Amino acid sequence: MEHSTWHRLLKEELPNHYFSKINQFMDKVYEEGTIYPPRDKVFNALLETPFEEVRVVILGQDPYHGPNQAQGLSFSVPETIPAPPSLVNILKELGEDLGPRSHHDLTTWAEQGVLLLNACLTVPAGRANGHAGQIWEPFTDAVIKVLNQKDTPVVFILWGGYARKKKSLVTNPKHAIIESAHPSPLSAYRGFFGSKPFSKANAYLVSQGQPPIDWLK
């Protein structure tokens, strides 16, 4: 990520030496135990989707905490791993909204400008939210703040109470916010199913003269 636009803009937004603090944190936790995703995938969302190309943001909470699931992209898992329940529901809603998608690795979304960002970028094995409140939130809030300053439209898709709290960071009238309940089985029937976030995001992008995302790719 070094030498990227992300690095330059985030360095301006964050307190001095914050990248050093993140590296020290990662040195410590990866040394002490099993952490997901693999260290070389921690910044995958920013590497797969350069700042200049971001058109949609889908905000998650933290990575999957089981073996071989997390790949540094919110909600996504490799094709070789069964889709977790939230991802099953995301693809179910996509099927109702725009049609069936035959695979569940979301890397092709990231390659089209969909930033798949978790608020925490690491998690200890088997401990959901185990790194919450330790280092990541100022960093990922800074990601949202620099995107808020973009001149081109960005659609922020916020699922669930945690993600929806971040909408206060999105103040630029050029951008759109689409929010609903979380796709988790605990809440999907309370407003996620039927919310049509994918077609709504595309409708906004097209209305602003931007190409739509091919969500089925």
UniProtKB/Swiss-Prot annotation:
Q: Give compartment(s).
A: Cytoplasm
Record bears the keyword DNA-binding: no
Q: Tell me the GO molecular function terms.
A: uracil DNA N-glycosylase activity
Task: Name the catalytic site residues.
Answer: D62
Q: What is this enzyme's catalytic activity, as reactions? A: Hydrolyzes single-stranded DNA or mismatched double-stranded DNA and polynucleotides, releasing free uracil
Which key words are in the record?
Answer: Cytoplasm, DNA damage, DNA repair, Hydrolase
Q: Which cysteines are joined by disulfide bonds?
A: none
- Cellular component GO terms, alphabetical: cytoplasm
Where in the sequence is the signal peptide annotated? none
Q: What's a Pfam family in this record?
A: UDG
Q: Report the EC number(s), separated by commas if there are several.
A: 3.2.2.27
Q: Which domain of life is it from?
A: Bacteria
Residue ranges of coiled coil:
none
Q: Name one GO biological process term.
A: base-excision repair, AP site formation via deaminated base removal
Q: Which InterPro entries does the protein's record reference? A: UDG_fam1, Ura-DNA_Glyclase_AS, Uracil-DNA_glycosylase-like, Uracil-DNA_glycosylase-like_sf
Among CDD domains, the record links this protein to: UDG-F1-like
Physiological role = Excises uracil residues from the DNA which can arise as a result of misincorporation of dUMP residues by DNA polymerase or due to deamination of cytosine.
Which protein family is named in the record? Belongs to the uracil-DNA glycosylase (UDG) superfamily. UNG family.
Q: What protein name does the entry list?
A: Uracil-DNA glycosylase
Task: State the gene name recorded for this protein.
Answer: ung
